[in-house]
Amino acid sequence: MGSDHRLTTRQMAEFVANGFIRFEAIVPTEINERGIDEMRRLELERFAPAGLKPPHTGTPLEECYPAPSAIGEYLRLPEIRGIIESFVGANPAFDHDFTHHLQPHSAYLQPLHVDAITDSPDPTFDIQLFWYPHDVAPGEGGTRFVPGSHLRRVRSSGLDRYQHIIGEQQFSGPAGTVVVFHHGLWHAGQPNPGDGDRWMHKVRLNPTVPQVRLWNTDDLVELHNPPSDHIFARMLPDSVAQVLRTMHPWMSITDYRNEQVQRARLWRYLTGDDTYDVDHYLTRLEGRAALVGSR
């Protein structure tokens, strides 16, 4: 993270390759403790005639969760504001939130899903912040997710028959950890075999500005490889392309190469560089297409 709390180019590239980025214990203890109390109220009063309510969809984030809200205080932490700005700008729109609560020994689980019915082919994206206000030990049922699945363009419930995907992860970590998901990342809530209540607050945010170079770009020139960078020819050993070549365990060779193309397209959007490429795939296709158009 940069000195202004925005993300670095390397962190943005890791997000493009993996579909998520994690910040351990970034929320202070006092806010975590008050956050659980607020989540409890939201759960009880969200659909009641009166009481604590979530913001209206479309509200600018800066107008959401006014003081003394612990959720608002967490979202206004300089570190969290820098993370949000890096992805969706300084004042994105509130989409929705939800309090996920499981009592001890609850067997409830979600099927694998994405939080979108269907997606357009453009590279824009929402982010979802998952805030875990208490410790979650390994095996205690934290969110299950599939790294690198975020650019697959699937329908929301088309994944519910899939289980035990190689390389999937299950959240565990210290109190105050925040995990930021691309809205297309495959995930599922899991049972709570532990002896304590498990709480998590999710908020989805929509961009209101083009998502171009919103992060701290001080290291962009150093890491941003030319379109000629090619693993089978000449390549830079430490570059964005090297990060975007990340291969997740569930990928076949064909999946892997197709995902590289999707990542390169997303990186073009994020940087505003329409010539960017990883391993010549897009440049090759576009060069041939130009020949057809010139007949």
PLM region spans:
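Non-heme Fe(II)/2-oxoglutarate
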Residues: 45, 185, 190-295
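Catalytic core of non-heme Fe(II) oxygenases with the double-stranded beta-helix
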Residues: 108-172, 210-219
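Short, solvent-exposed loop/turn segments at secondary-structure junctions
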Residues: 28-29, 100-102, 117, 136-138, ...
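A structural signal for short, well-ordered beta-strand segments
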Residues: 97-99, 129-131, 201-205
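Active-site rim elements
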Residues: 68-73, 165-167, 188-190
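Non-heme Fe(II)-dependent double-stranded beta-helix
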Residues: 1-18, 24-119
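Conserved metal-binding segment of the jelly-roll/cupin
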Residues: 173-187
